[in-house]
Amino acid sequence: MLVVGWDGADWRTIDPLIERGEMPNLKRFLDEGVRGNIATLQPMLSPMLWTSIATGKHADRHGVLGFAEPDPKTGKARPVTSSSRRCKAIWNILTDAGRPSGVINWYATHPAERIEGFVVTDRFAIATGALTQGEPHDGWPPVPGSVHPTEDLDLLAAVRIHPMMISPDQVRELVPSATDEECFTDPKLRELRVLLAHCATVHNAATAYLDERPWDFLGIYYDAIDRIAHAFMEFNPPRMAHISEADFARYKGVMEGVYRLHDMMLGRVMKLIDDETAVIICSDHGFYSDNRRPEGSSTIKAGKPVAWHRTFGMVALWGPGIKRGDQIHGATLLDITPTVLRLLDMPVARDMDGRPLVQAFETVGETMPTCETYENDTSHLPSGEALDDETTSHEMMRQLRDLGYIGDDDATGVEIDQLRNLGTVYLSTGRPRLALEQFRRVLDAKPEENGAIMTVATALLQMGRLEACEEMLDRVADDPEAAPRASLTRALVRERRGDLEGATIILEELVQSGLPSPGLLGQMGRMYLRRDLLDKAESLFVRALEYEPEDPEALDGLGVVYRRTGRAPEAVLAHVRSIALMRHRPQTHLNLARALLDADRVPWALDACRVAARMSPRDPTPHELLAEVYATRVGNAEKAAFHRKRAEALRAARQRRHEGPRKAGTPEPRGEAVTIVTGLPRSGTSLLMQMLEAGGIPALTDSLREADDDNPRGYYELEAVKRTATDDSWLDEAGGCCVKIVTALLRALPGDRQYRVVFLRRDIDEILASQAKMLNRLGRSGAALDTAELRRAFEEDLRATQEWLTHQPNIRVLEVWYGNTVKDAAGEAARLAEFVGEDLDQHAMAGAVDDGLYRQRRAKS
């Protein structure tokens, strides 16, 4: 399994080159494989993105939060290291499984980890000294700790390319007018030589290992496209206003030349692998290259570099088991590692944020092997002090400063950058409360930083705290640079308050000021949509798509217009195109469901509703639509009632969360306590969840696992619970709700919260009988233990869990026996209500108990 990373690669530059026959190796790859867009993550900073690619996890979980990190020894900043990563990368997972792997030039890999295989870190290719012929290593000593095994360091040092080794003829492949002297004196050409030398060194290190060492996985990361694009994309045709005719003529061919170089390197790599190797090529984001480029310079120091990054990069797959000549849709950076695991016939961990790109596979089995996690106590970092070369670290920090990625080398500045980046991760993944915490800490250090003020305002808006949001906007009222974003946010505040006309006026003023963008045009379109001005809305969505054809929000809005104007087939197509670009948008799936209903595609509409409910488990809207469809289009009264009840509970919970301050004399709200239902599998936990929900406590569930013969009323599970050990963010809004957690996951609960645990007990033999029946129905064998051994294992688990619970000061426990609940539902409902301390509907709770479901009751002797 080979993964080739091309930082910043974009189909919009690649496709014209392929059409002209200038990237023949990639064309052959695509003809025999599949291709698609891949959605990036926020913030678009390479170390964070490539670590997400290598782990399948968001940055708040993998821990790499930028280009630099504080050095605990010196108190200064240093380039980000492998010790920052808090979870397993794919090469660590394979090492734990005894399978060899290799990684070349990946971000945050120095010092080299001691894996089963080989590592060439992101510091190996950096030229830290002058080239001096005749001296050891030509006066350019290799970086300690940059290669594993260490005995390969001298061998690989011989394949490095120093910038002084890049000849004028090689420069002229990209800049034909360059003279010999200019290649050594012109700052722009000297920068190009440095970047080409780095790229060549990475490629040489990769090819040195490719056919010489065994590997089941190899990751090669080329950063040249992105780095050279920041230096030269502003010269790409068509000529930008700030570029002179002379500079345009001189540098206009650089970027296409860089892509041709990568095609040649791809051809060499493909010759060194066999037909049994699957290959993924991907980028971490795209790069604007045409008339959609932002104003100003593309350089990192002089311009706004992230503005040049496009939301969608490229991904392509080739090899055994991969379809030929097909397209894939909805991929994200988080999907690469799960896909690699699947292609290597290894389970995909349920605590990963991504999913395998099975749409690229020729065949997909009925079931996909999974495991809870690959996280364990093993570490592959070098023992003792991490090897760090002061010269290399200094050179990298100087380069990062010169490029504008970081400020000075003071650790405080880096820590503030990490707060910003972590806050951006939280905000972009729908966790505004956590984002607010990070950016408030930024403002504690830099009270006048308007960018942080605006982000705090955005977080407050998402949380519904409109007055606090406006207070933050007032702080940037005199900043002309912040004015457009502040005006847009004020418009959204007015929209939240129901003043759609006032919001529209602000947006129209923004457009008339000469600041239109796809996002702004789309926002105006949605505002007109809410006001039922469909012609105006359609016009704005079309304008947004003319500017950016791959805008998922504009496509979604256009689909709504189509549906509401009687064009259901066109609406379905628009929503599907939106989802193909960015899959995790629950509202788009809901809009698709409505369009499918208008097109009389009821089964597909139900599927789309379920996806929306799964993606947004606290939103009542998908359940309301499901209830309506089951009642009026399917004729299933039981399922309609189930979803109607679920929607009512979720809407009541939402209302409680948004209520104002409590009046004197009113009962205490639920606050932060979470009610947890736990017990062994098949002990009856779903029944307890039904009782609590019937009583008025909202149940946290994503409806991912549907009802079946074993649980006719549903399983009441939340998939995110399984990842609690590495991501407990689902608890942020779980206060006042009930959730089902198996006993094995209780210890993963963070200790800074209050929990009410309802521990369901049931006769072990009944549990074993129920499990056996379920396994038989599913055609599975279960554990390789006899009944007596299983009984002992379960009894020991119960004993250990109960012992652990007695020592947790933040957990209250109520033990409930399943048999008693079935026999005396009213009595157990009263006990539950007293334990929870709520004014629950005990009659409804008792009514949720169906004695007919007690099918494995133990016969009395």
What are these regions (language model features)?
Residues V3, N25, G257-S298, V340:
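Metal-dependent active-site segment of extracytoplasmic phospho-/sulfohydrolases and closely related
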Residues L41, A112, E116-R123, R662-C737, ...:
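PAPS-dependent sulfotransferase catalytic core
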Residues K57-E245:
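His/Asp/Glu-rich, glycine-adjacent segments
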Residues G267, S298-M346:
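Substrate-binding rim/cap in mid-to-C-terminal beta-strand-loop elements of soluble/periplasmic
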Residues A278-P320, D353, P369-C371:
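Histidine-centered active-site microenvironments of extracellular/periplasmic hydrolases
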Residues A435, C469, A503, A537, ...:
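Single-residue signature of alpha-solenoid repeat helices
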Residues A613, C738-D841:
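PAPS-dependent sulfotransferase catalytic domain
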